[in-house]
């Protein structure tokens, strides 16, 4: 059975169904209805069309996905003004970064991944580039913030994560917020969390850091920030 994802403000296990027939192995367009219902009987439904395409062929063992990039000068032109700061976020996925060039390009800050959790209930792993990134960012006079990629599914876990983050960053000059990065919505239904519960998890992470003098924030796309977080 295909996994169907949904979330409710207070029900940690809402019913999520797709009404209509479809076949993911057969190319075509399928008119379907997505239905979500909570334990109080509140129901929402949305009509949508599922498009199933032929898979793209890939030759030579490579990837069919094209690598895209953004012109930083274009970002500055669009977003930089007297009321804004423009910067980047970095992790091991960017490899070894020349932060002098980052500074020269016009970046004013860097949000650095300190680490991540290995799935729900998993260990905390320091980003292998964290120490290099933060040392060189600070040496190049860039403002620094932090983020941790979390799978926290309860307040106790969130507190432990915040304490772990504090241990990693306490010896550095962190002048921007420490962010809670929760992106694992593909696993959300298995966590037995409501959106209210998830917000309480984030608040626990924040309050633990704020008690030590750090500013905090959420890390996420505009869509999730508007839809998920209160």
Regions found by a protein language model. Give the residues of each.
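Substrate-binding cleft of extracellular glycoside hydrolase catalytic domains
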Residues: 80-206, 210-212
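Functionally critical loop-and-helix segments that line ligand-binding/catalytic clefts
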Residues: 60-92
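Solvent-exposed, low-complexity, repeat-rich "mucin-like" stalks and linkers
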Residues: 1-12, 57
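Extracellular interdomain linker/stem segments of modular secreted and single-pass surface proteins
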Residues: 51-61
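Serine/threonine-rich, repeat-prone extracellular segments and beta-strand-based repeat modules
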Residues: 10-52
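Aromatic-lined carbohydrate-recognition surfaces of secreted/lumenal glycan-active proteins
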Residues: 209-227
């Amino acid at each position: 059975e295909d996994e169907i994802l949904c979330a409710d403000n207070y029900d940690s296990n809402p019913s999520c169904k797709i009404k209509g027939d479809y076949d993911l192995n057969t190319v075509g367009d399928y008119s379907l209805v997505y239905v979500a219902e909570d334990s109080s009987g509140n129901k929402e439904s949305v009509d949508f069309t599922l498009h199933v395409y032929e898979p793209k062929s890939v030759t030579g063992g490579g990837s069919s996905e094209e690598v895209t990039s953004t012109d930083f000068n274009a970002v500055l032109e669009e977003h930089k003004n007297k009321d804004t700061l423009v910067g980047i976020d970095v992790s091991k996925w960017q490899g070894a970064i020349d932060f002098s060039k980052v500074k020269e390009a016009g970046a004013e800050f860097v949000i650095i991944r300190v680490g991540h959790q290995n799935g729900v209930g998993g260990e905390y792993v320091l980003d292998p580039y964290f120490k290099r990134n933060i040392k060189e960012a600070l040496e190049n006079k860039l403002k620094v913030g932090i983020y941790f990629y979390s799978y926290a599914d309860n307040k106790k876990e969130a507190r432990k994560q915040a304490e772990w983050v504090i241990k990693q960053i306490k010896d550095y000059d962190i002048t921007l917020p420490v962010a809670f990065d929760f992106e694992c919505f593909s696993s959300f239904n298995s966590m037995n969390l409501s959106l209210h519960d998830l917000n309480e998890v984030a608040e626990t992470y924040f309050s633990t850091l704020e008690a030590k003098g750090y500013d905090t924030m959420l890390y996420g796309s505009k869509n999730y920030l508007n839809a998920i977080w209160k």
